[in-house]
Swiss-Prot record:
Gene3D superfamilies, A to Z: 1.20.1280.50
PANTHER family found in the cross-reference section: BNACNNG10540D PROTEIN, F-BOX PROTEIN CPR30-LIKE
One protein family per Pfam: FBA_1
Lineage: Eukaryota, Viridiplantae, Streptophyta, Embryophyta, Tracheophyta
Listed name of the protein: F-box/kelch-repeat protein At3g13680
InterPro entries reported for this sequence: F-box-assoc_dom_typ1, F-box-assoc_interact_dom, F-box-like_dom_sf, F-box_dom, Gal_Oxase/kelch_b-propeller, SCF_F-box_component
UniProt keyword annotations, A-Z: Kelch repeat, Repeat
Annotated signal peptide: none
SUPFAM superfamilies: F-box domain, Galactose oxidase, central domain
Kelch repeat locations: 154-202, 210-256, 265-314, 337-383
Keyword Repeat tagged: yes
Keyword Repeat (UniProt): yes
Occurrences of domain F-box (ranges): 1-47
Length: 395
């Protein structure tokens, strides 16, 4: 009699490649062989990459969702775009979030009411609540990373207003000690809350603007820089060049990780909505960076201030941008949109539905879609297990 353990390894790998990310825990418990293959096979990553399928996680309607995006038909004359498969994660269905971040197979969820953080390992099905040293704020910036010993940490950047000058505070949460530590950092940069950063190889990167003091008043210089936070040293590295210059104009910028190997940056000046520019790194580490052009398009849609997360397909030469539709004062609702832009002014859009109005008469009134990972790789990092619906102290 043939059992599940008798199936050929290549057949098991094919089966595992078709299993949703959030169901792998149940599959692993079927037999020892399947458990071992699921760890080494990494969710059929090779197969999905060959088929132009992007697997990951995102935030939609204040909920954590798994995402599968198939770009196989893009740029083909007879090809049709398969709409993204977005499914709410049932394990976290009691949790409303305002931001999501990803690093090393872990997902960091910022709770919507700003009362706590939740770290989730989708592969192991484990969660860990993290409690604040003091109150979280709506404009806090976060990053997830790890040091040279693979010890995971969280960076929090928050605003202090002791005077009319804008001042930032910095603190780091250490998973191994279950504690926060305030950093002695004298900020020389302004990291806007709507500037979306990204984690790469354990370090966190942020777009920023250098500060200068004129007549005792701090103002924003016109120099745009990329900052790297080194989780081993728990310090920022030197300011690195970005592949654009805003000339002190208002602009939007967002970072994305490319296959855990490169960074991509999306840039748009608010006075020139018809143009979007995307560049990717040729080389990057905490002290150096070089860039190359990936895409410049004039398809003409303004990226929403608090949205604009994206990923790129290097083979198809397209970018997939998650956004809100353009605001119109006469409309009573807005829609969550996926824009697909490419060379030669290629443009498609997918309507993902009405964006919930979560804060009437607020500058963040509508719930934006945010993608935090498009090339998810499972992690064996152990978290203390606690139920998402109950906030217990972590040991």
């Amino acid at each position: 009699m043939t059992t599940m353990g008798d199936l050929p390894g290549d057949l098991v790998e094919e089966i595992l490649s078709r299993v949703p990310l959030t169901s792998l825990r149940a599959i692993r418990s079927t037999c020892q062989k399947w458990n071992s293959l699921s760890k080494s096979q990494i969710c059929g990553r090779k197969a999905t990459a060959a088929e132009n399928k992007f697997l990951g996680f995102m935030m939609k309607d204040s909920r954590v969702c798994s995402m599968k995006f198939d770009l196989q038909g893009i740029r083909n004359d007879d090809g049709e775009l398969v709409e993204p498969s977005i499914k709410q994660v049932s394990k976290l269905d009691q949790i409303e979030v305002s931001q999501v971040f990803h690093c090393d197979g872990l997902v960091l969820c910022i709770i919507k009411d700003n009362t706590g953080l939740l770290v989730w390992n989708p592969y192991l099905g484990q969660t860990r609540w993290i409690h604040p040293r003091n109150n979280y704020q709506i404009e806090d910036r976060y990053a997830l990373g790890y040091d040279n010993n693979r010890n995971h940490k969280i960076l929090r950047i928050f605003d202090l207003y002791p005077s009319s000058n804008r001042v930032f505070g910095y603190e780091v949460y250490d998973f191994s000690s279950n504690s926060w530590k305030v950093l002695d950092v004298i900020p020389e940069w302004d990291i806007q809350s709507h500037f979306r950063g990204a984690s790469l190889k354990g370090n966190a990167y942020f777009p920023a603007q250098k500060k200068e003091t004129v007549g005792g008043i701090k103002t924003i210089n016109i120099e745009d820089v990329l900052l790297c936070f080194d989780f081993t040293r728990e310090r920022f590295g030197p300011p690195l060049p970005l592949p654009f210059h805003s000339y002190n104009a208002d602009f939007f910028v967002s970072l994305a990780c490319v296959r855990e190997e490169q960074l991509a940056v999306l840039y748009q000046r608010w006075g020139a909505f018809e143009t979007i520019e995307i560049c990717v790194t040729n080389k990057i580490d905490p002290n150096t960076v070089s860039w190359s052009k990936f895409l410049i398009t004039s398809t003409g849609f303004p990226v929403d201030t608090f949205s604009g997360s994206f990923f790129i397909d290097e083979e198809k030469k397209v970018a997939v941008v998650f956004d809100l539709d353009r605001y119109k004062p006469t409309e009573t609702c807005r829609y969550q949109i996926v824009y697909i832009i490419g060379q030669d002014e290629y443009f498609k859009s997918v309507n993902m539905g009405v964006a919930p109005n979560i804060a009437k008469n607020s500058y963040q009134a509508y719930c934006v879609p945010l993608v935090c990972s498009s090339s998810y790789v499972p992690s064996l990092v152990q978290l203390q297990i606690n139920k998402p619906g109950k906030r217990k102290e972590s040991n």
